[in-house]
């Protein structure tokens, strides 16, 4: 399916999330990562989330992308054939319980590909 390049640069709605200790510990436990950094809440520095927890925080956008696209004329039929292809993360500091995150994004590219059109979100 061909998608118009007019959507490049379109901002997504912001996702707000306040991180809880339960979320970070559940994620660490579910992935089998038992490092004290993620569970020992008596550490002077407190606990932190595993680095890949960042993917879990952003996942609601991928899961409900239509809720985050503001353009009424974005072709909704492509959503039913979407595939999460790749993710690229940059870490500047650990995520900690109590952090209030605002996840923002935009359509940064629409690229033709032999297997279908790639919609790149940044």
Predicted feature locations:
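Hydrophobic beta-sheet segments that form the core/acyl-binding groove
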Residues: 82-122
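Hot-dog-fold acyl-thioester-processing enzymes
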Residues: 1-84
């Amino acid at each position: 399916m061909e998608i118009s390049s007019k959507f490049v640069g379109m901002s997504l709605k912001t996702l707000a999330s306040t991180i809880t200790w339960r979320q970070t510990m559940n994620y660490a436990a579910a992935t089998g990562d038992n490092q004290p950094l993620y569970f020992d809440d008596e550490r002077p520095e407190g606990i932190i989330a595993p680095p890949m927890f960042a993917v879990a925080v952003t996942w609601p956008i991928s899961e409900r992308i239509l809720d985050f696209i503001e353009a009424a004329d974005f072709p909704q039929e492509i959503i039913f054939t979407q595939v999460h292809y790749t993710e690229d993360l940059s870490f500047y500091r650990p995520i900690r319980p109590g952090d209030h995150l605002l996840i923002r994004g935009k359509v940064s590219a629409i690229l033709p590909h032999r297997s279908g059109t790639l919609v790149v979100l940044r």
